[in-house]
């Protein structure tokens, strides 16, 4: 049986979206959906530690990182569990999300249920920016929109 989750992204500005998650038993998580209101180009896309949006996206804390690793790209061995890389918005400001990730999960120790999905202002440099901030956040900049990931039917 597949596990499913959903996240509605909202921010202070125009950025909004809906992201769906689906995981078949012990398989990778399929992440799909769309985000609108973005500037054209790449935007960092991460699961953050807390499902707390009481002070907007800032109260979601750092990237979800239960293994205490450095920030990296989604295909890197050295990465936070929540590091999903970038989503790319076209000229229309819409990013179509289609990601398959074997590290995040909808159950167990790496479960993202109840945590916050965040889309960032700038591209994620995937930990290769050559400075300390790169190894923590990928220099992805401010948090444009976020939402808590919840269980879906």
From Swiss-Prot:
A lipid is attached at residue 7 (S-palmitoyl cysteine). The modification N6-acetyllysine is found at residues 122, 136. One of its GO terms (biological process) is removal of superoxide radicals. Pfam families: Sod_Cu. Its cofactor is Cu cation; Zn(2+). This is Superoxide dismutase [Cu-Zn]. Its main location: cytoplasm. Palmitoylation helps nuclear targeting and decreases catalytic activity. Succinylation, adjacent to copper catalytic site, probably inhibits activity. Desuccinylation by SIRT5 enhances activity. It is found in: Cytoplasm; Nucleus. Homodimer; non-disulfide-linked. Heterodimer with SOD1. The heterodimer CCS:SOD1 interacts with SLC31A1; this heterotrimer is Cu(1+)-mediated and its maintenance is regulated through SOD1 activation. Binds 1 copper ion per subunit. Binds 1 zinc ion per subunit. The modification N-acetylalanine is found at residue 2. Its EC number is 1.15.1.1. Destroys radicals which are normally produced within the cells and which are toxic to biological systems. It comes from Camelus dromedarius. The modification N6-succinyllysine is found at residues 4, 10, 91, 122, 136. Keywords: Acetylation, Antioxidant, Copper, Cytoplasm, Disulfide bond, Lipoprotein, Metal-binding, Nucleus, Oxidoreductase, Palmitate, Phosphoprotein, Zinc.
């Amino acid at each position: 049986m597949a596990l499913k989750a959903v996240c509605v992204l909202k921010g202070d500005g125009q950025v909004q979206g809906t992201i769906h998650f689906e995981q078949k038993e012990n398989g990778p998580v399929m992440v799909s959906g769309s985000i609108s209101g973005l500037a054209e180009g790449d935007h960092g896309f991460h699961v953050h530690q807390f499902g707390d949006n009481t002070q907007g996206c800032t109260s979601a804390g750092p990237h979800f990182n239960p293994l205490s690793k450095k920030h990296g790209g989604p295909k890197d061995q050295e990465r936070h569990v929540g590091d999903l890389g970038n989503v790319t918005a076209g000229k229309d400001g819409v990013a179509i999300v289609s990601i398959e990730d074997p590290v995040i999960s909808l159950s167990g120790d790496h479960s993202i249920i109840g945590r916050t999905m965040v889309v960032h202002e700038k591209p994620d440099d995937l930990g290769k920016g050559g400075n300390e901030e790169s190894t923590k956040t990928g220099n992805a900049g401010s948090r444009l929109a976020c939402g808590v990931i919840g269980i879906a039917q």
